Amino acid sequence: MTPFETFWPETFRHAKQHSPFYREQFRDISDAPRLEELQTVDKTILSARNSDFLSVPRERIAEIVTTSGTTGKPLLWMLTESDVDRLALNEQISFECAGVTPRDTVLVAVSLDRCFIAGLAYWQGLRKLGCTVVRVGASSAMLVLEMIERVRPTVIVGVPSFLRVIADKAAELKFDLKNCPVKKAVCIGEPIRDVKFVLNKSGQAIEAAWGAKVYSTYGVTELANSLCECDAGMGGHLHDQQLHLEILDDAGKPVAPGETGEVVATTFGVEAMPLIRYRTGDCAAMLYEPCRCGRTSPRLGPIIGRKNQKLKLKGTSLFPSTLQAVLEECVGVESFAIVARAENELSDSVEVLYHGDAAVAGLGEAMQARAKILPKIRHASREEIEALQLPSRDGGARKRRTFVDLR
């Protein structure tokens, strides 16, 4: 039997019996049906009926986390003790995929506060793997450098933009980061590869500054699951005993293997808040051929964008990530924001604001060459761009955004 055939019937039974939302959805269905016969759910439904997805008594909840709030109000997400164990096992498998072993000392440069699931997950998974774990957090580049000098970690986990901040601080202090013991950088929360699996500017900068190999990951709070790539760097390996993924087109139909569509997930083994056919809103492709590392599990390719962020511009559809890649590669662009507004039913209005000494004409040529379109481009102050990237400093979104959707 396949993992899906093994775990799907129990997932369906548990959700139907214990989740108010799924009890209502499945009231006319007795046995586990074909998955594609069921309706999908998205974050709008989760937000409107958050508590109706709880499938255990409240006293069994061991942890409460929240989503990042990047695309809306943060959701409350709950885990039982068993769910936390599942989370730890998932991360153990992911770190093993990246070649991390019990002999490694791992610096976790990720927040463990503000109800953030990732820091909790990495700490639990690394402990389960048997590593020495240093929870340094993400508040101070100087502290990270001090701990690198004192504990000599071999692996670091962090958001790519923060790893670059650390590298800049090291250069300022003439700290020899490239020859420090860190040989692996597990990157979370931001892309480091393009759709062709080539390292983007951020990934290249981290490898150059740290002298370490970078590993891309993909995770979603609501799934309490993440995927990590192996040394081949050709997609995150799926843990198919914990998660089933579909890739669907705009009509909700499966795309052909290797084609891009929306990532739709069904969780296995979750007690508190199981999800069935959850539309993540992320767009990517699945690869099914065996990996060069020898694993035969399916792999999820780089996320090319959010489905609801797709832009329509002068008869062309594209994701903001295409423009972001151009801006990241242009010498002289220090920071930027892409602002989308509704123009009419057939087209959006897109304005690119950047700070730095790059020429507007050069940026325009690069965008026409890569994206086949020429949006409005304007030089802006660092403060104006910062205000767009971080609109709220009190609560709300935790991530710096470079795409601002005002449609």
Where are these regions (language model features)?
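Nucleotide 5′-phosphate-binding alpha/beta core
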Residues: 1-66, 71-89, 93-97, 102-103, ...
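Active-site glycine/GP-rich loop and adjacent strand/helix microenvironment
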Residues: 2-13, 129-407
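Beta-hairpin (beta-strand-turn-beta-strand) motif
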Residues: 82, 111-112, 138
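Short, well-ordered alpha-helical scaffold segments within catalytic/effector domains
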Residues: 85-92, 119, 141, 145
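Short, small-residue-enriched loops and turns at beta-alpha junctions
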Residues: 85, 112-116, 193-194
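Acidic/glycine-enriched edge-of-secondary-structure segments
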Residues: 72-86, 123-124, 130-132, 153-162
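Conserved AMP-binding loop of ANL adenylate-forming enzymes
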Residues: 92, 96-125, 129
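Hydrophobic alpha-helical segments that mediate membrane insertion or helix-helix packing
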Residues: 67-68, 106, 126, 245
